Amino acid sequence: MKLSKIDRHLVLLTLLENGVPQGLIDANDILETLAPFVNDALGFRMETEQVLYYSENAFGTADAISFKNNFLRIHDYKSGITPVHMDQLYIYAALFCLEYVVKPENIKIELRIYKQGEVLCEEPDPEVIRAIMNKIVDSDKFLRKLKEEER
């Protein structure tokens, strides 16, 4: 299955069924970004809405993710008008490595954000992911200690 401009009416119907007022959205604008996101996720056989969990203090949900042949892909779909940053996806990559005990130095990572008809793509430096992992671990230890002291 592939999402195309022909599916515009399905996108519009789904939005209307979910309470989005008709005049508020432009299905063509949404489809311009949504189609590549969906088609890439299908093409790369990615899992969607995947929870990445390190602890009760450090977790998130990736829109689309796959890990095959030591290649981690994380894709995010953005529909708003606020500026986007890759920081969230860097954190997701770090959470993935922590949860599945994967060394970022031993894998290739590709992060993509789909927004307003554009695809932003980065291949983060493993050292940056490692630094984020360390920060997550340290922050989690600190928060656990605080919670213990509150008891």
Q: Could you describe each region identified by the protein language model?
A:
Residues L15-N18, F96, I136:
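Alpha-helix boundary/capping residues
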Residues L52-N134:
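Nucleic-acid nuclease catalytic cores
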Residues S4-K5, V20-G23, A27, E122-D125, ...:
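Intrinsic-disorder-associated interaction segments
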Residues M1-T61:
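Metal-dependent nuclease catalytic cores that hydrolyze phosphodiester bonds in DNA/RNA
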